[in-house]
Structure formats: C-alpha cells, structure tokens
UniProtKB/Swiss-Prot annotation:
The gene is potB. GO terms for biological process: transmembrane transport. Required for the activity of the bacterial transport system of putrescine and spermidine. It comes from Mycoplasma genitalium (strain ATCC 33530 / DSM 19775 / NCTC 10195 / G37). This is Spermidine/putrescine transport system permease protein PotB homolog. PROSITE patterns: ABC_TM1 (PS50928).
C-alpha cells in the first residue's frame, strides 16, 4: 500500500512530462519525418545537410557552450568549495543569493541589463557614451552565456560540498598527505556527480540558447544553433516545408547532442566495464 502511494505522488510529474515534453517531442519527430506540400523527406533535409548554415551554426554554439562549461567549472569549483567551508551562515546566504540572481530574475531583463552595461563600458573606452549597439563579435555571446548559465554550475557543486564528510580530509591529512594532494584525491572524486550535473545543466542551455546572440552580437556573422532553428520556425508560419525543416534541424541537433553526451558520460563506463571483464577473463585462464 505504501508503494502505491509513492506511485500516486509521481503521477503529477509524469503528467507534466507527458504534456510538455513527450507530446511536443513526438510532434517534432513526426513533423520531421513526413513530407510537406509535396516535398519528399530528402528534399526537406537536403538544405540542412548539403549547406553549411546548419553545421556552421552548430559549430559556433558548440565551441561557445564548451568554453562556457570550462569557465563556469573553473570559477565555481574552488569558489563553492571554500564557501561551503565557511562557518558564517549569514555570509553564505548572502553570497548564494547574489550568485544565483541570474536564475530567479527575468531572462530578458538580464540580457538587457548586460547589453546596457557593455554598451556603457565600451562607450566610455571609445569616448562614445550614449551610443548603442557597440558589441560586435562572438566573444560577447560567450560572455552572455557565461553570465547566464554559471549559476547552474554553482548550485550542484555547492550543495554537494555542503555534505562533504570532513573526516575524509582529516583522514587524508593524518596519512601524511598535504592539502593539495588531499584536494585532488578526495574532494574532486567526491564531487564527480555534481560536476557532471553542473556540466549538463550548463552545456545544453548554452548550446541551444536563442536570444543571447541576437542581443549581444550585432555583427550577425556567427549565427548560433538556437537562432538558426528559431529562424526556420518563424518561416514555418507561412511555409509547411520550412516548419518541417525546423523540426528536422531539431532532430539532427538532438542526435548530435545525444552522441556527444553518450561519448562523454556512458562510453567511458562501458569501456571500464569491458576492461574489467576482460581482466577477470584473463585471470580465469
């Protein structure tokens, strides 16, 4: 009876997942795999595969998201560790509230605020105060993704460090290891799960973000993946073929993203399992 109650508690979650994720994804897959207005599936996918627009935008988003993850991890890891070791609860609450501002404030307001600040700083340096749209280049898009998505790396690491058993570090120090060795051999392996969670929460939103490049990069030379799909979707209001191509672009991007995730997360585990079984097989003979 107790187990059945747990299943009932999971019902709202599965209901929301079905309405807002499974059904839309099923519609996207069906739209991407059916012909539109007499055009075959190959004709619908040909502009995506033969042209460089999709792959250029995917590559731009990929390197921006990878650099965002690296910068966010390098900043958040030591910061969260030392913050979790602080005994001042008021200080920790204040720092957490400041660090997580980009999460609980409006996405659009954050972009407008960052754009205004950058225009002001660049205007002061160029003696062009009052001019707008002074941000040109993918570097500003990268700056925006770092600013917006670093808190998603911060929270998993901080919550994980708060439950780090202090006796592990003390035991390492009692064995004669210095602080750096203890940090590398104890703290980093302990936080592996939190790092993977933070990487996933930072990488995928940065990869598929839409409005950041439109707001912060006025050169429009390097279109991101989110903007590319958004443009196809806008054209889809008047053309069923463009709508189908937008769905196809989402499917291709999802497959490539899944391949990256599988290579980074699951493939090392599979290799480790196969390697261990091979060792056991060799020992048996």
């Amino acid at each position: 009876m107790h187990i059945k109650k747990k299943y009932w508690l999971l019902l709202p979650f599965f209901l929301l997942m079905t309405i807002f994720f499974i059904i839309p994804m099923a519609w996207i897959i069906v739209s991407g795999l059916q012909s539109e207005d007499g055009a075959s599936i190959s004709q619908k996918y040909e502009p995506l595969v033969s042209g460089l627009g999709f792959f250029n935008s995917f590559w731009t988003s990929l390197w921006i998201s990878i650099v965002t993850v690296i910068v966010a991890l390098l900043f958040s890891f030591p910061f969260c560790y030392f913050l979790s070791q602080s005994k001042n609860k008021i200080f920790k609450a204040f720092v957490i509230s400041i660090a997580t501002v980009p999460i609980w404030s409006s996405f659009l307001i954050k972009l407008i605020g960052l754009k205004t600040l950058l225009d002001l700083l660049i205007g002061l340096s160029l003696n062009r105060v009052g001019d707008n749209n002074l941000t040109f280049g993918s570097g500003y898009t990268l700056l925006g993704t770092i600013y917006l998505f670093t808190p998603f790396m911060f929270l998993p690491l901080y919550n994980h460090f708060c439950v780090l058993p202090k006796n592990l570090l003390l035991a390492s120090q009692d064995l004669g290891y210095n602080w750096i060795y203890s940090f590398v051999k104890v703290v980093i392996p302990f936080s592996k799960t939190a790092m993977l969670s933070g990487i996933a929460l930072t990488f995928f939103p940065a990869l598929t973000s839409v409005a950041i490049a439109q707001f912060l990069d006025n050169s429009n030379q390097a279109e991101t993946l989110g903007n590319y799909i958004f443009t196809l979707g806008n054209n889809g209001y008047d053309s069923a073929i463009e709508r189908g191509r937008a769905a196809g672009a989402i499917i291709i991007a999802a497959l490539i993203t899944f391949a990256i995730y599988f290579t980074v997360v699951f493939l090392p585990k599979i290799v480790r399992i196969v390697h261990n079984k091979w060792k056991q097989h060799e020992k048996a003979f």
